[in-house]
UniProtKB/Swiss-Prot annotation:
Keyword Transferase listed: no
One GO CC term, this protein: cytoplasm
Family: Belongs to the prefoldin subunit beta family.
Organism whose genome encodes this protein: Tetraodon nigroviridis
Annotated keywords: Chaperone
Pfam family, one: Prefoldin_2
Subunit structure: Heterohexamer of two PFD-alpha type and four PFD-beta type subunits.
Disulfide-linked positions: none
Molecular function via GO: protein folding chaperone; unfolded protein binding
InterPro entries: PFD_beta-like, Prefoldin
Protein name in the entry: Prefoldin subunit 1
Role description: Binds specifically to cytosolic chaperonin (c-CPN) and transfers target proteins to it. Binds to nascent polypeptide chain and promotes folding in an environment in which there are many competing pathways for nonnative proteins.
Length: 122
């Protein structure tokens, strides 16, 4: 009977280790994505502040791939605002995902601790 419990603990530890590694990778990926989205937000904010100092009749071009398209100041400003909003929403989603991942690992660790306590009580 002790061998079965030891096997169960060993299996649980193996599963926990795999889950922790997977979760750490996902959390690292989320951090990288958050960093990238933060850069997008800063770039859009900087571009908007630079555009604000320009006169309204200034010809503005937006880079699309390998070409530039003539756009109005308002169109570019709207595009930058949308990009900031989208990036902000994605950052919030990624933050929530990270919290969920961390919570799930903590719950798994708590379950293992409970198994160990139950084993010691026997």
């Amino acid at each position: 009977m002790a061998a079965t419990i030891d096997e169960e603990l060993k299996k649980a530890f193996t599963e926990l280790q795999a889950k922790v590694i997977d979760t750490q990778q996902k959390a690292r990926l989320a951090d990288l994505q958050i960093d990238q989205l933060t850069k997008v937000q800063k770039h859009a904010r900087l571009t908007q502040t630079e555009m604000a100092s320009l006169p309204d009749n200034t010809r503005l071009y937006e880079g699309v791939g390998r070409m530039f398209i003539l756009r109005s100041k308002e169109e570019i400003n709207n595009h930058l605002t949308d990009a900031q909003k989208t990036a902000d929403e994605k950052v919030k989603e990624l933050e929530q995902k990270k919290v969920y991942l961390e919570r799930s690992v903590k719950e798994a660790e708590d379950n293992i601790r409970e198994m160990l306590m139950a084993r010691r009580a026997q």
